[in-house]
Amino acid sequence: MSAIRYELIKTDKQTGARLGKIHTPHGTFDTPMFMPVGTLATVKTMSPEELKAMGAGIILSNTYHLWLRPGEELIREAGGLHKFMNWDQPILTDSGGFQVFSLSKMRDIKEEGVHFRNHLNGDKLFLSPEKAIQIQNALGSDIMMSFDECPPYPASHEYMKKSVERTSRWAERGLKAHVRPEDQGLFGIVQGGAYEDLRAQSAKDLVSLDFPGYSIGGLSVGEPKDVMNRVLEHTTPLLPANKPRYLMGVGSPDSLIDGVIRGVDMFDCVLPTRIARNGTCMTSSGRLVIKNAKFTHDFRPIDENCDCYTCKNYSRAYIRHLIRCEETFGIRLTTYHNLHFLLNLMKQVRGAIMEDRLADFREEFFEQYGFNRPDAKNF
């Protein structure tokens, strides 16, 4: 019996987008869903109660960072990640692969795994497919990721082909190392860059291993948005319709909607929390940089169409003052707003699928947000 189960509720007649639920050992969440990122077992400045109140059905934590600090054995001793951070709903952990390839300047990729330097202190470390699974088994997340190679964009077809083949072999090794399949669902990660033939090969390899869910990796790494959309259009039909599909590292409003239209169920990204710390806010009419001087005497909320805690209680002028003074409360307010904005957007997307009007919703949202303008400002 798999630890997780995908339930398809409805398909949008306009686009083919999926409305569903994912059942896990720690509860069920609606899809499509955006997952806030809690890198070190916390979503920066947010409490679990606040995240639940705004509709976060699942959050993500980073295996690499938790392995380094505080260590997976301490978290196992605490009773697992859920008890350690007092979060009783689903948790997804990544494999650590992305961090190994993005944070470490010194790395050596071998068949057995990756030798690299700790980005904090320079110590030599080694991460293999088996080790990545062992760490996640200790963390006790509901959904785990296979260890994959994350090639840069762009990369040659020759390099990408070898990388895809290695990732497929690593996925099989990780599956064999997984000792808690009844408690934790392990996803395979489809790679292949912008090459459709390699995406097809990667998907075929992973589907043959019968994972309970599939991730699409190697996108949102610098490629143009039309390339990402083309890759998704080619890749999602190759994945089983009765299992969840997760697009990794995507969190801008337009990419979330376009990903859903192309059959994706789950998304994560640090974008809403990272830009919030610099005072950049997502609003129903586009990007708003709260530090700008024009908001000095602006006593309206960040977004007059938003009913989040921040917008119901505080003005642009006040939040601008806090952010400019580097007050933590200002970061809390912008973080709360951005997460609420994306989670509410996904709620609206689910409603549009239920009403078979997702294409219409996209058109309306893009027009209001300003994505259709020649000078459109994205994130």
From Swiss-Prot:
Residue ranges of the region described as RNA binding: 249-255, 273-277
Any GO molecular function: tRNA-guanosine(34) queuine transglycosylase activity
Domain of life: Bacteria
GO biological process: queuosine biosynthetic process; tRNA wobble guanine modification; tRNA-guanine transglycosylation
Cofactor (UniProt): Zn(2+)
Cofactor note: Binds 1 zinc ion per subunit.
InterPro entries per UniProt: ArchSynthase1/Queuine_TRR, TGT, TGT-like_sf, tRNA_ribo_trans-like
Binding residues for substrate: D94, S95, G96, G97, F98, D148, Q191, G218
Active site: D94, D268
Keywords annotated in UniProt: Glycosyltransferase, Metal-binding, Queuosine biosynthesis, Transferase, tRNA processing, Zinc
Entry keyword Metal-binding: yes
Residues binding Zn(2+), per UniProt: C306, C308, C311, H337
Pfam families linked: TGT
TM helices/strands, residue ranges: none
Reaction equation(s) it catalyzes: 7-aminomethyl-7-carbaguanine + guanosine(34) in tRNA = 7-aminomethyl-7-carbaguanosine(34) in tRNA + guanine
One GO CC term, this protein: cytosol
EC number: 2.4.2.29
Annotated family: Belongs to the queuine tRNA-ribosyltransferase family.
Subunit: Homodimer. Within each dimer, one monomer is responsible for RNA recognition and catalysis, while the other monomer binds to the replacement base PreQ1.
Function field: Catalyzes the base-exchange of a guanine (G) residue with the queuine precursor 7-aminomethyl-7-deazaguanine (PreQ1) at position 34 (anticodon wobble position) in tRNAs with GU(N) anticodons (tRNA-Asp, -Asn, -His and -Tyr). Catalysis occurs through a double-displacement mechanism. The nucleophile active site attacks the C1' of nucleotide 34 to detach the guanine base from the RNA, forming a covalent enzyme-RNA intermediate. The proton acceptor active site deprotonates the incoming PreQ1, allowing a nucleophilic attack on the C1' of the ribose to form the product.
Protein name: Queuine tRNA-ribosyltransferase
Native species: Listeria monocytogenes serotype 4b (strain CLIP80459)
